[in-house]
Amino acid sequence: MVNPPLSIGGKVGEWVQGIDKTGAPVIYSLTVTRSPFNPRTFVDRSDALSVLIDHEPLEDHSKTRRAILELANAYGFAHDCKYRIVICGSPPRGKGLGSSSIDMASALVGLREERALNVSKTDLYKIMCKVERSDYLFDPQFIVAANPLDGTHTVVTRAPDCSVLAWDTEPEKSVKTEAAMHLDSRRKPYEREYCDIFKMMATGDISLILRAATRSAELNDRLLPKVGFEAARKLVKELGHIGLVSAHTGTWLGFLLPRPIDADALLRISEFFAHCLKREPTRFETGEIC
């Protein structure tokens, strides 16, 4: 019997990415409650362990496989880890959309359900972080501050109800997670500013969250510039009541619009996409979906 698929929601960049007072990385992944990518994961018994991810070369399966084996070793079923895991619909890699974290998280959750394991989301995330710097994706209704190196994390506040109208600034480019680790040290001059940004996030006030996200994107553009950033930033400043979100180690940017969406803001942003970017936006949603 084939089990029904499960889905782990993804993300579009980060609300904020910075460092704490010790210089350790802190990531507030912008997890979404609705995404056009809609990944699905199937977990079924087999004669041996296999991981299949559609449209991806075999080497890109290794992280998910390593996470599975970490779980199996930790919970005593390494001798019986015989499953066929198929992952369909993951976002493109190297873009800041959380594809490898989606793959690992969904495989681990699928095995937890299949084997009825008593393992927390915290422990699953720590396993993911053993494999690589990972996004915390398990509670999309919240904004979570996470250390992607050791897996520690804290729920900061509820995610605001926003629509994200986003685009890939460089479709032909990808950014490897490992290649961007040096950005942690380059953020050190902005440590005090990140502290202020974190405080704004903790208020839960949507206007301050939008300001914090925009400021984090501005700081990040000094470190990893994105095509078209200044034009997008200018529009955000003109409109005043929206935010700008960045994939801090990827290629995507997005406008954050509180719901219900202001009609004038939507018109201006639609014109920006039509005339400046000459493409349609990719739409994501955060917070509660009616």
Which positions does each model-derived feature cover?
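ATP-binding N-lobe of GHMP and related small-molecule kinases
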Residues: 1-94
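Short beta-strand segments
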Residues: 9, 31, 139, 166-170, ...
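Short beta-strand scaffold segments in enzyme catalytic cores
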Residues: 12-18, 37-42, 136, 142-146, ...
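Long, contiguous secondary-structure blocks with strong helical propensity
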Residues: 35-46, 61-68, 81-92, 104-115, ...
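DPxDG-like acidic metal-binding loop motif
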Residues: 97-121, 137
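ATP-dependent small-molecule kinase catalytic core of the GHMP/sugar-kinase superfamily
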Residues: 119-242, 256-290
